[in-house]
């Protein structure tokens, strides 16, 4: 309904007029879309087998804009039969992530209709990968995604595979020791880029060690200028001989030189250089009479000194805190930025529970090797936690992962306290804030040779005073001629380990404690209580094409 307005001027003229504000149509706006949502119970189960150390997919699902997912995970895990009731801890960890579609395919938004220019193409299809010769094998990444195995030339969408690699790169890879795995956003892909991956070991004294004292070059004090080299002795040198031919220690370049043939202390730059004479230099020629005149060098200012200290501090903080952008924000600024804001997989939730070991005593003797009351064991774990509730605003993928890990215990090293020799090897408050100190090789793998005192990695100053390592002694040592190491999961190295990609990969020695080693070590029965509210009708009724 139009409202009639009159102004003072209009009243004088006796004329009314319509408001221009109400005559305008809002061409800059479009009608708001009201999409009704419906609730769907999408609960389901999963039964699978897997090995320890690996990141194993247990859930993969498409997410729509407007979805709200409420998920609860109930897991029952059974371990393969144990030879002994192990005295160690095993844990089952679960992780759930959301990966936006646009992070794993560069043309997704264009396929949906987005254009940089009016004539840009929007004709795209989802990227795919094709099964290799013989098809994907059981217990492969594709198998755990629910794709049929042993079928050649089977073509499937590539995005979940890319999500898996991206999650590994961002969340489970040690950026100081491991290269990122293959990842592409392009339209084409290769199935060879994707395999089951091991998570990194949880951090302790050794696994959190740095490969260098700081993440960057060593900071040097900025001395300036050139220091001339002068001589306090007299030698004779044939002009055709270059300086480097007589002094291999000098690496720089220069012209042919000769020493003064006079009683004066002429030095390098004197005009009294001798240009003839003997064919060979005297045998006593050496570098000892040479020295650098530092009086010509520019001194370091206080500000340069301060700057060098702060740059060193920056490199040390970068080494400790990490240099992924989210790590930089947290380490340097104390800011926790949401994963979605930083264009990375978003962690939704997860959980962890322990596997319980139960003793099985033998009740009848079969032979001398297996007497009555001989102990074996079985191990199971159960949990009902680790879910999440989340509303989503864009297309993407929901990825769930499971992993089994063990406590990290070392048995071949020498505790640092046994190697202290001077007062400066002890703790002193004066030195508490010095830079990183070296972890010696003998702390993780003692050999009794020169390698023992070389650096394995670098840890914070006096870190050995801040924790106490678990120990393995007696016949439990794996190095004993007749070890009882089937009772525990301590690490055993066949040679000196290095702080490397191989060292940081989680690989608990479960093979050592199970009765059958060539079958999967863990059996999983999972139930996902999954309720989704989606922008969809409860039923699709034919004929209601103009309704939603």
Predicted regions and their residues:
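Intrinsically disordered, low-complexity segments
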Residues: 1-548
């Amino acid at each position: 309904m139009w409202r009639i307005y009159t102004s003072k001027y209009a009243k004088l003229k006796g004329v009314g007029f319509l408001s221009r504000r109400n005559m305008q149509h809002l061409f800059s706006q479009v009608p708001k879309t009201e999409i009704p949502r419906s609730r769907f119970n999408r609960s389901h189960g999963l039964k699978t087998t897997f090995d320890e150390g690996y990141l194993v997919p247990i859930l993969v699902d498409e997410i729509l804009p407007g979805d709200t997912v409420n998920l609860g995970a109930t897991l029952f895990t059974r371990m393969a039969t144990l030879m002994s009731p192990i005295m160690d801890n095993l844990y089952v960890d679960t992780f759930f992530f959301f990966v936006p579609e646009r992070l794993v395919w560069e043309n997704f938004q264009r396929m949906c209709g987005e254009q940089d220019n009016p004539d840009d193409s929007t004709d795209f299809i989802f990227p795919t990968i094709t099964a290799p010769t013989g098809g994907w094998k059981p217990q492969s990444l594709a198998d755990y995604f629910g794709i049929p195995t042993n079928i050649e030339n089977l073509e499937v969408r590539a995005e979940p595979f890319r999500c898996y690699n991206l999650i590994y790169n961002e969340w489970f890879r040690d950026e100081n020791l491991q290269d990122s795995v293959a990842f592409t956003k392009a339209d084409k892909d290769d199935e060879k880029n994707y395999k089951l991956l091991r998570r990194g070991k949880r951090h302790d004294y050794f696994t959190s060690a740095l490969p260098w004292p700081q993440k960057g070059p060593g900071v040097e004090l900025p001395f300036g200028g050139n220091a001339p080299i002068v001589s306090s002795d007299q030698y004779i040198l044939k002009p055709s001989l270059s300086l480097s031919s007589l002094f291999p220690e000098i690496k720089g370049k220069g012209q042919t030189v000769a020493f003064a043939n006079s009683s004066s202390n002429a030095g390098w730059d004197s005009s009294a250089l001798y240009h003839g004479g003997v064919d060979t230099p005297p045998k006593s020629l050496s570098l000892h009479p040479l020295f650098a005149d530092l009086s010509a060098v520019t001194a370091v200012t206080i500000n340069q000194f301060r700057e060098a200290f702060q740059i060193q501090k920056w490199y040390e903080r970068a080494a400790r805190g990490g240099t992924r952008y989210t790590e930089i924000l947290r380490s340097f600024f104390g800011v926790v930025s949401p994963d979605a804001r930083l264009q990375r997989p978003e962690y939704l939730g997860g959980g962890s529970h322990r596997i319980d070991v139960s003793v099985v005593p033998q009740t009848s003797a079969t032979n001398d090797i297996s007497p009555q009351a001989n102990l074996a064991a079985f191990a199971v774990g159960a949990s009902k936690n680790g879910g999440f509730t989340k509303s989503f605003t864009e297309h993407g993928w929901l990825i769930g992962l499971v992993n089994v890990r063990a406590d990290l215990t070392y048995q071949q090293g020498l505790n640092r306290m046994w190697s202290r020799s001077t007062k400066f090897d002890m703790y002193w408050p004066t030195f508490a804030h010095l830079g990183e100190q070296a972890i010696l090789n003998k702390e993780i793998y003692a050999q009794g040779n020169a390698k023992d005192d070389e650096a394995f990695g670098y840890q914070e100053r006096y870190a050995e005073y801040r924790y106490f390592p678990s120990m393995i002694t007696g016949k439990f040592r794996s190095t004993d001629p007749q070890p009882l190491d089937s009772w525990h999961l301590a690490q055993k190295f066949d040679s000196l380990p290095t702080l490397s990609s191989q060292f940081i990969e989680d690989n608990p020695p479960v093979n050592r404690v199970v009765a059958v080693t060539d079958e999967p070590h863990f059996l999983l029965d999972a139930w996902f209580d999954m309720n989704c509210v989606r922008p969809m009708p409860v039923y699709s009724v034919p004929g209601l094409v103009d309704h939603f």
